[in-house]
Amino acid sequence: MRGHQIVAMDLPLEDPDAGAVRYAEAVLQALQGAGDDVVLVGHSMSGLFIPFVANQRAVRKLVYLAAGIPKVGTSVVDRVLHGNESDMFNPAHLNKDPSKDEAVAIEILFHDCKPEVAHWAISKLRHQASRVVFAEISPIQAMPDIESAYIVCTEDRTVDPAWSKRTARELLGVEAIALPSGHCPQISRPVHLAEVLTSLTK
């Protein structure tokens, strides 16, 4: 993204006890010294804790990329099993770990990548040891009162695109921006994604 400083996050994926607060702390630490003009992008699971970050420090905009959105007072598990959001995830791939099974990784994450790109991406995958962020009641007391955007990946095989569109409207009050890609456009369509993200910084 030309003209923009990019801050990459090193999340504590290997910590079996890490929940939203622990993940948010890692983001807050990475953003030390970044100033106030921050557009924070949360991909996939990261959407569940980027609002917590925005409640702790100055953030200009939140962007959810094929991401979960937290709901105050409940957990993702309860929403899926006992609420009206059973379509949040693709049920065919629940309890399958793409970091341990190359075929699963290609099927649900990198199906729209060139083979050599998919294999490179698989080599970079890290196992997410904790499921706390999905099982815990969201620690967010209130959603931050800042501008938000949602990018729905129309060929997503992990987070259901229909759920993304509906929930972006219901919880964020925005119409999702459609990106023709699978769950990981930063791998399969980086130029297109960069264009969309750049437009959202204006």
Q: How would you name each of these model-derived features?
A:
Residues 24-28, 190-198:
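Short, amphipathic alpha-helical "lid/cap" segments that border enzyme active or binding sites
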Residues 5-39, 54, 77-82:
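Active-site loop/oxyanion-hole signature of alpha/beta-hydrolase fold enzymes
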Residues 96-145:
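Conserved alpha/beta-hydrolase catalytic His-Asp/Glu region
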Residues 41-46, 50:
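Gly/Ala-rich beta-loop-alpha elbow adjacent to hydrolase catalytic centers
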